[in-house]
């Protein structure tokens, strides 16, 4: 084995190794999820060298510099103040979703007007209108980290694959018999998965446009789906109160997670794929061991339905958003609530951590988005100006831009 190059991954912090083995170029990653601005660099580099034979003494200085750069990134933008940069009268009907590419250079908006639009983040200019769907464009995504393709899922029962650069439609995936409400690319960007009101999920080959496999077994609509970090497994959450873990290559059921007593609103893996988090209309979140499929904790405290939930990149913190107008942060190890985020005057439908993991973004029916301090629960900023509920909000990869999308037909860029 011969090390060819070292590359940085900023969020979550890690060093990617490109090496040659048997004439083939391979990659692996050293995940530094515990890294903080106060970590002792020399100690950490010593630990890395103990476990990674490719990092020899001659590479010590280089690795030390890379770790220091990662620490700088964790300090950057972590206390950013956001100001309104642009209001985009994006669509003639309400927006359904917004999504950014990894570079943050452009973002997309889906709408009830049957289109998806591609926007330049720096200028707020419209780059493309993706037309062709015959009903609401509901689910949208970039194939991050690459960002050169866009998938759109529609109430017209089809999913379309587009070029992010030219706006050209590559494929229309047909096969669902009801509305498509969620979708996701696998991390390798070889497959797109769609979840539908027809109770199935389907995986589609991006190159050929062919259906790879259909995931059948749910008894009601699939409302949420996501891949694990490796792309080997996919998880689906349904209105039948269950979550199913599937083998992404064969479509075989690996686990059925039974325990919630109402519809599932969100289901996702932690970054290291060891835990699964599920949120439900039964007012609870449940934490599951991803290997055994056993429930390890039920997170309680909300007085109404949980509408969204997420992990931070370390997998140590969990955030939940509820129809009770509050959000909560839980410690994933102790399963205790650390902070309660209070201030919204309506239900919170979206929540996400910034890439640095020290801020939370929430979007609410009270027409505002808010930025919160994760540790104290203090509201740091209220992003005001929308005239109707906020459906969707997101940080860019650096954490210094926020996009909000609203029922008022507009989206706003904050930076």
Swiss-Prot record:
The keyword Transferase is annotated on this UniProt entry: no
An annotated Gene Ontology molecular function: ubiquitin-like ligase-substrate adaptor activity
WD repeat start and end residues: 90-129, 132-174, 175-214, 217-256, 259-298, 301-340, 343-384, 386-415
Regions that span the bilayer: none
Alphabetical GO biological process terms: cerebrospinal fluid circulation; determination of left/right symmetry; epithelial cilium movement involved in extracellular fluid movement; establishment of localization in cell; heart development; intraciliary transport; outer dynein arm assembly; protein polyubiquitination
Compartment(s) of residence: Cytoplasm, Cytoskeleton, Flagellum basal body; Cytoplasm, Cytoskeleton, Flagellum axoneme
Disulphide connectivity of cysteines: none
Matches recorded under CDD domains: WD40
PROSITE patterns tied to this protein: WD_REPEATS_1, WD_REPEATS_2, WD_REPEATS_REGION
Keywords: Cell projection, Cilium, Cytoplasm, Cytoskeleton, Flagellum, Repeat, WD repeat
Pfam family, one: WD40
InterPro entries for this protein: G-protein_beta_WD-40_rep (IPR020472), WD40/YVTN_repeat-like_dom_sf (IPR015943), WD40_repeat_CS (IPR019775), WD40_repeat_dom_sf (IPR036322), WD40_rpt (IPR001680)
GO terms for cellular component: ciliary basal body; cilium; cytoplasm; extracellular region; motile cilium; SCF ubiquitin ligase complex
Function: Required for axonemal dynein assembly and ciliary motility in ciliated organs, including Kupffer's vesicle, during embryogenesis. Facilitates the onset of robust cilia motility during development.
UniProt xrefs under PANTHER family: F-BOX AND WD REPEAT DOMAIN CONTAINING 7, WD40 REPEAT PROTEIN
Subunit relationships: Interacts with IFT46.
Similarity comment: Belongs to the WD repeat WDR69 family.
Protein name: Dynein assembly factor with WD repeat domains 1
């Amino acid at each position: 084995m011969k090390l060819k190059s070292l590359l940085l991954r900023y969020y979550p912090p890690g060093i990617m190794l490109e090496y040659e083995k048997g004439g083939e170029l391979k990659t692996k990653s050293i995940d530094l999820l515990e890294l903080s601005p106060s970590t002792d660099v020399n100690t950490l580099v010593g630990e890395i060298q103990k476990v990674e034979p490719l990092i020899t003494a001659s590479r010590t200085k280089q690795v030390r510099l890379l770790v220091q750069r990662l620490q700088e990134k964790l300090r950057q933008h972590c206390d950013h103040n956001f100001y309104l940069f642009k209001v985009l009268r994006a669509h003639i009907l309400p927006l359904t979703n917004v999504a950014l590419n990894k570079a943050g250079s452009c973002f997309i908006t889906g709408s009830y007007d049957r289109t998806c639009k591609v926007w330049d983040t720096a200028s707020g200019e419209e780059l493309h209108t993706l037309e062709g769907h015959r009903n609401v464009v509901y689910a949208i995504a970039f194939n991050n980290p690459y960002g050169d393709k866009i998938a759109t899922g529609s109430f017209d029962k089809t999913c379309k694959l587009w070029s992010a650069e030219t706006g050209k439609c590559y494929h229309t995936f047909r096969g669902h018999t009801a509305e498509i409400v969620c979708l996701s690319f696998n991390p390798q960007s070889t497959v797109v998965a769609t979840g539908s009101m027809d109770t199935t999920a389907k995986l589609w080959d991006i190159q050929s446009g062919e259906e790879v496999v259909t995931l059948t077994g749910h008894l009601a609509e699939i409302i949420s789906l996501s891949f694990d970090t490796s792309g080997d497994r996919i998880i689906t959450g349904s209105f039948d109160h269950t979550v199913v873990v599937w083998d992404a290559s064969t479509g075989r059921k690996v686990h059925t997670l039974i325990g919630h007593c109402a519809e599932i609103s969100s289901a996702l893996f932690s970054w290291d794929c060891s835990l699964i988090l599920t949120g439900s209309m039964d007012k609870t979140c449940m934490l599951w061991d991803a290997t055994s499929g056993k429930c390890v904790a039920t997170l309680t405290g909300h007085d109404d339905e949980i509408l969204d939930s997420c992990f931070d990149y370390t997998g140590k913190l969990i955030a939940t958003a509820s129809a009770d107008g509050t959000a909560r942060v839980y410690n994933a190890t102790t399963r205790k609530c650390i902070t309660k985020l209070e201030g919204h005057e309506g239900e919170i439908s979206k929540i996400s951590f910034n890439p640095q993991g020290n801020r939370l973004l929430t979007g609410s029916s009270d027409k505002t988005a808010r930025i919160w301090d994760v540790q104290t629960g203090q509201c740091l900023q209220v992003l005001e100006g929308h005239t109707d509920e906020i459906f969707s909000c997101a940080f860019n990869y650096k954490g210094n831009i926020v996009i909000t999308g609203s029922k008022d037909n507009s989206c706003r860029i904050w930076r």
